[in-house]
UniProtKB/Swiss-Prot annotation:
It catalyses: UDP-N-acetyl-alpha-D-muramoyl-L-alanyl-D-glutamate + meso-2,6-diaminopimelate + ATP = UDP-N-acetyl-alpha-D-muramoyl-L-alanyl-gamma-D-glutamyl-meso-2,6-diaminopimelate + ADP + phosphate + H(+). NCBIfam families: murE, PRK00139.1-2, PRK00139.1-4. Its cofactor is Mg(2+). One of its GO terms (cellular component) is cytoplasm. This is UDP-N-acetylmuramoyl-L-alanyl-D-glutamate--2,6-diaminopimelate ligase. It is found in: Cytoplasm. A motif (Meso-diaminopimelate recognition motif) lies at residues 402-405.
Amino acid sequence: MELRDLIGALEAPMLMGADNVDITNIQSDSRRVTKGSLFVAVRGTAVDGHAYMDSAIEKGAVAIVCEETPSYLEGRCSFIVVKDSAEALGLLVSRWYGDPSRKLMLVGVTGTNGKTTIATLLYEMFRKMGHKVGLLSTVCNYIDGEAVPTDHTTPDPLTLHSLMARMVEAGCEYAFMEVSSHSIDQRRISGLSFDGGIFTNLTRDHLDYHKTVENYLKAKKKFFDDLPAGTFALTNADDKSGLVMLQNTKAKKLTYSLRTLADFKGKILESHFEGTDLIINGREVMVHFVGRFNAYNLLAVYGAAVSLGKDPEEVLIVLSTLRSVSGRFETIQSPLGYTAIVDYAHTPDALTNVLNGIHEVLDGKGRIITVVGAGGNRDKGKRPLMAKEAVKLSDQVILTSDNPRFEEPDDIINDMVAGLTKMDMERTLCITDRTQAIKTATMLAKKGDVILVAGKGHEDYQEIKGVKQHFDDREKLREIFSTQQS
């Protein structure tokens, strides 16, 4: 593709040099540049691509997109100067792949909790309705039925548009994706054409990156601000930030709620470990999900499907057949008559939601034993809050290690303990080894009790000193249960 055809996707680019050069590929990592590359110099959180423009030229880049050009490089290749090279990258890659997101009905899901569940259930629902569908999520990306492993909630623009192009090639009509606050702030979703957006909730998370809750909220809100007319913006009316998301959007404004009047109104009739009886917009449905937080997720799924033109009755029928997402309130039964639940809850609010969901079902008839940790090199402020919520809503808590990364696990546990009183500590054990922590919980549990193993969910690794070592909470529990005699 010629450079002039590519830069037509950009707003007011300043070209220095020839525009008729042939581009063989687009790169934002100078190490991947080859002969004929267009190199986009992006200012990242840790690395500034502008420092590698010289290296990119030496490796064969014939054009560079940047925010400023050093005079000593002028004349060595074509330069395109833009206001925001991160924004430009997405637009260029989209053009390179033929703007694939415009050929799909693309819906983004953002918020602190619930993104994976909502995006995955929409993917499964639309497949059950006979459509070819794509999914971009924390757990895995899917092109119709083909799994494509993932490392981030939202991939980089090169991967993202490449996946979208593969979805179009595979005949997909719809795509559902998680949209993280990082990806919005870093313009990783630049160049994508969304047909709708869903907001779940907003609680403390990622403050190691955003610094304040206000910045975190602004990042989420920008996604809705950028939705054009003719799309839909569906928000949780019961979350204090829900209506804020709709303030400046041009999209059709829609709400879902369990507490107030809304376009999609739900009510919980009864909860049990097999599922929940719900009323949605006056129609009763039995679903295979537990807890109030999941009722919100299902309302969002219902609302999005109806907003995409699906028949409400058909949506309810399919909703009743859907099952829980991997590592989200995933139940494993012990032969000794107690239940283990593995959940990804890794924020204070998510932990509260899951524990409240367990209480709704137990109704005071069994004890709750919670195994929980906090990730290393992430928001330290949430550590004492996690411990506090766990103790408040559990009968016994075991604090343990959870992806310590480059921190010492005991230091993280000490940060968690800082949120507890002497009385709280009477119901709290600190066991650094996660395997031992899970084993201890199973030794303490009796018939009718529930063990919650929180924080990792679908993850099958522990990240220690930069190395991901295999570790799966579900595997550990099944190994223990396989040795138990009823």
